[in-house]
């Protein structure tokens, strides 16, 4: 079965049970939104240089996500735990790509953010047909979040960004935060697009 044949209807899986486990929500330092092409910012980005505390917190978040997703280096493990490919391979015009989003429908829709349980794990298709884990994506629907919160979500100092509706994914408005924990992004660990991620191999395998 090709990767494209594994793609399923995403919106039917959006409502799942509440997440369990410890939450790692940021309330230590002020929100800092890094430049993220392709998303509407949830708030105006702070252009001042980050403090050492903010840098430490950002590095800590990357480590937490990397440790929490290490087992998903084998995509079969992600599939076994309920993640499934959605949207095909997401690429941008001149800004690189996001890659392949494997979404856990049971973790989406609760309005809860847990740094150790990302709603999405991200892969890049390789020329040999394998998939390489590149990072994770945290996603919460705007309407679910707004029930109990007046401010946009943030995770350990990183402000989520808003995708308004309608959008290319056909979803209601949602907040999202990418964490490139497994493939260094020269534009920053939390930007949406990765200039060194490509959909070329995915496209070649699914022609």
Predicted regions and their residues:
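Cleavable N-terminal signal peptides
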Residues: 21-23, 33, 40
